[in-house]
Curated annotation (Swiss-Prot):
Task performed by this protein: Ubiquitin-like protein that can be covalently attached to proteins as a monomer or as a lysine-linked polymer. Regulates the life cycle of promyelocytic leukemia nuclear bodies (PML-NBs). PolySUMO1P1/SUMO5 conjugation on 'Lys-160' of PML facilitates recruitment of PML-NB components, which enlarges PML-NB. SUMO1P1/SUMO5 also increases polySUMO2/3 conjugation of PML, resulting in RNF4-mediated disruption of PML-NBs.
Listed name of the protein: Small ubiquitin-related modifier 5
Summary of subunit composition and partner proteins: Interacts with CBX4. Interacts with PIAS1. Found in a complex with SAE2. Interacts with UBE2I. Interacts with SP100. Interacts with HIPK2. Interacts with DAXX. Interacts with PML-RARA oncoprotein; PML-RARalpha outcompetes PML for SUMO1P1/SUMO5 conjugation.
Gene that produces this protein: SUMO1P1
SMART domains the record matches: UBQ (SM00213)
Source organism (scientific name): Homo sapiens (Human)
One of the GO biological process terms: PML body organization
Main location: nucleus
Disulphide bonds in the chain: none
Glycyl lysine isopeptide (Gly-Lys) (interchain with K-? in acceptor proteins) crosslink location in chain: G97
Similarity-based family: Belongs to the ubiquitin family. SUMO subfamily.
UniProt KW Nucleotide-binding keyword: no
C-alpha cells in the first residue's frame, strides 16, 4: 500500500465539516426560544429573515447578537466560530433617544 492510499484526503474532510449542519438557539427578549438548523457556510441573513417572518416583524426592527457582538447579514456560523446549540440573542432595535435637561 502506498502512502497516497493510506492517508485520507484532508481537503475532502474540510469540505465535509464546512457543509455540516448545526443547531442554533435563537432567544428573544421575552425568553421565547426557536431552534434553527443551518449549514456552517450559510449567511446568517437567512436565519434572521426566517426568525422575523415567524415573529411577524421587519428584519430591521431587531438586532441579533452572538457572544455580545452584532451579527451582520453576511456573517456565517463558521466565521463566528459557532458550535452546536450556541445561542443567538435577539433584541428590539433602539434608535435615537435624548437626554432630559
Amino acid at each position: 500500500m502506498s502512502d497516497l492510499e493510506a492517508k485520507p484526503s484532508t481537503e475532502h474532510l474540510g469540505d465535509k465539516i464546512k457543509d455540516e449542519d448545526i443547531k442554533l438557539r435563537v432567544i428573544g427578549q421575552d425568553s421565547s426560544e426557536i431552534h434553527f438548523k443551518v449549514k456552517m457556510t450559510t449567511p446568517l441573513k437567512k436565519l434572521k429573515k426566517s426568525y422575523c417572518q415567524r415573529q411577524g416583524v421587519p428584519v430591521n426592527s431587531l438586532r441579533f447578537l452572538f457572544e455580545g457582538q452584532r451579527i451582520a447579514d453576511n456573517h456565517t456560523p463558521e466565521e463566528l466560530g459557532m458550535e452546536e446549540e450556541d445561542v443567538i440573542e435577539v433584541y428590539q432595535e433602539q434608535i435615537g433617544g435624548h437626554s432630559t435637561v
